């Protein structure tokens, strides 16, 4: 990931992240990684309806274009993350890839890191579901803001 700091997010880079995540796994051996999803999937333990495989080829470039034209601040990162997770573009590993992208965006743009640790995992998932079902990232921004206050000493946001 360090090699990609300063490198623009592209569909190919997202696929590279997913390929690295699954390297050496059964998914990779079975040809189930290294590309966007081709089978409908869902978020485990959630009622959120994610994008269909046929929507991904246009939805991902649109999301990336929106990111490139954004102010690249805390709110933009939160919004991007909620939308990425709602698309759920890969067969597996979307949460891990989404959090990796979020960390890359924070580092590149001088934004306090948004870190979700185990003690906040359930709350994170609940807030993400609210953000995705209400078609707004306000909930995820509030959660990330409160998580930052808990995890970043001296944060005054």
Task: Report residues per predicted region.
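FIC/Doc superfamily catalytic core
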Residues: 1-157
């Amino acid at each position: 990931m360090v090699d990609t700091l300063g490198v623009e997010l592209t569909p190919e880079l997202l696929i590279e992240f997913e390929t690295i995540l699954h390297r050496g796994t059964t998914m990779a051996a079975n040809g189930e990684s290294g590309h966007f999803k081709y089978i409908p999937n869902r978020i485990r333990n959630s009622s959120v309806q994610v994008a269909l495989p046929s929507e991904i080829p246009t939805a991902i470039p649109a999301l990336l274009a929106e990111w490139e034209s954004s102010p690249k601040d805390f709110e933009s990162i939160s919004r991007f993350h909620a939308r990425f997770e709602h698309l759920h573009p890969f067969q597996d590993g979307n949460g891990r890839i989404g959090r990796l992208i979020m960390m890359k965006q924070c580092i590149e743009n001088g934004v306090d890191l948004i870190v979700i640790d185990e003690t906040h995992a359930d709350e994170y998932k609940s807030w993400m579901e609210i953000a995705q079902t209400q078609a707004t990232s306000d909930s995820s921004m509030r959660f990330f803001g409160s998580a930052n206050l808990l995890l970043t000493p001296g944060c005054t946001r």
